[in-house]
Amino acid sequence: MASSLPLETVMSCPRLDDRSGATAAPKSLAFSIDRIMSKTSEPKAAAAEERSEGKKTVGLCSPIPCMIPIQPFSYDLQAKALMNYSEFWKVNFRGALCTSAAMCKTNCGVCSKADAGIKHSVLPGTRVIKPQVIHQALAMPANGSLCYFNYLDSAYQSELLSGHLFSSAIANSQAQAISAHQKLLLLENAKLACVSPEKFPTPQYPHKEHLPGQLDQIVRESHNLTEKNGVKAHSKTNNCSSDGKPKNFTCEVCGKVFNAHYNLTRHMPVHTGARPFVCKVCGKGFRQASTLCRHKIIHTQEKPHKCNQCGKAFNRSSTLNTHIRIHAGYKPFVCEFCGKGFHQKGNYKNHKLTHSGEKQYKCSICSKAFHQIYNLTFHMHTHNDKKPFTCGTCGKGFCRNFDLKKHIRKLHDNANCLSGGNDSSRGHQN
């Protein structure tokens, strides 16, 4: 836990050299490092000077790179968003750099009044830091905010030497301005990070990478960027019109309305029949990659979910829950045309297509038509002699695993044969 005095940054400062009358010697530097690392209070003179000026900056004047690590803070980093610092600096601070002298003025909340280049990018009372060395780790845990930046191995060292680091209080107070600049937010590259305190730099490893691969990043804490209030709220702004009203995206085929264009895009394959994600084992196609990933589980041998009544095992718990409906006789999906009931919604939808008489998926070889595209996919195996599911008892091949199981139940109604047939078919697939 950090000391009670909020640590805003550690930096080199020529003005402090002038006040002390001489450049700090290595011995005094080592003393300062030991004092900070041991979390003891500052010398009385330094503390009195800080109280008189109302500053929070600890100055370490040395020509060598600052190797003082950040102490582990008891901050909840669950809602921290990562933001590329170099992009932020290019947008807000290019051509508006403050000097080292300006950094040491008592009223340097905005560097100086004469430094008009920054304008309203920062607010009075907010520290704007100009780093003096490349290998410098900065932290500003003050008033519930935390910013961290590490210049080590930065790809923008020449520019970042004259860059600025600022507290997230600036961004929090300018929420509307930030929302107006998508480059500033960089939400398309933002990630929510959950970093444990042990990943912060330690005395043994001053520049320990606390965010792997993200040295050129700022960890920015903001209540406006939490997953609930910020990221979702920002995504809503992209789907709102200029007057603030939410946009509606309507499907031109069926008239279904969506609140985001992305959802409309996911919906369109329902009408086009496109199933670009195809299982390499059985050839079944899917509209979404996530559905294909869930489907692949059925081809594995792991079936941890077992039915307590019949002992049948399943890959997923949701499949087991659907299976339990069979024992309970529960068929919640009833066809409004013939009254036939179904345990699963998918089977119900497939059955309804038989009443419509529409078979839009036709085989290019034999012109046989099907209600659904995956039935056509399985049918194509009959033309290329591809039958990935083989019975382990008689060696007969099938295009679908369902047909193999039905064959085993009818002709080889034996539990051992069923187990052997499944194992054999899986071995043939792999």
Swiss-Prot record:
Tissue: No expression seen in DA or 5HT neurons.
Subcellular location(s) per record: Nucleus
A single cellular component GO annotation: nucleus
Alphabetical list of Pfam families matching this protein: zf-C2H2, zf-C2H2_6
GO molecular function, one term: RNA polymerase II cis-regulatory region sequence-specific DNA binding
Domain of life (superkingdom): Eukaryota
Classification via InterPro entries: Znf_C2H2_sf, Znf_C2H2_type
Gene Ontology terms: biological process: central nervous system neuron development; commissural neuron axon guidance; diencephalon development; forebrain development; forebrain neuron differentiation; hypothalamus development; mammillary body development; negative regulation of DNA-templated transcription
Motif, Engrailed homology 1 repressor: chain positions: 27-42
Assigned keywords, A-Z: Developmental protein, Differentiation, DNA-binding, Metal-binding, Neurogenesis, Nucleus, Repeat, Repressor, Transcription, Transcription regulation, Zinc, Zinc-finger
Zn-finger region bounds: C2H2-type: 249-271, 277-299, 305-327, 333-355, 361-383, 389-412
UniProt function note: Transcription repressor. Component of the regulatory cascade that controls the development of dopaminergic (DA) and serotonergic (5HT) neurons.
PANTHER family linked to this entry: ZINC FINGER PROTEIN (PTHR24394), ZINC FINGER PROTEIN 771 (PTHR24394:SF48)
Family, similarity comment: Belongs to the krueppel C2H2-type zinc-finger protein family.
Miscellaneous field: In one-eyed pinhead (oep) and cyclops (cyc) mutants, expression in the ventral forebrain was eliminated. Overexpression induced ectopic dlx2 and dlx6 expression. The tof mutant has a reduced number of tyrosine hydroxylase-positive and dopamine beta-hydroxylase-negative DA neurons.
Protein name: Fez family zinc finger protein 2
Phylogenetic lineage: Eukaryota, Metazoa, Chordata, Craniata, Vertebrata
Gene this protein is translated from: fezf2
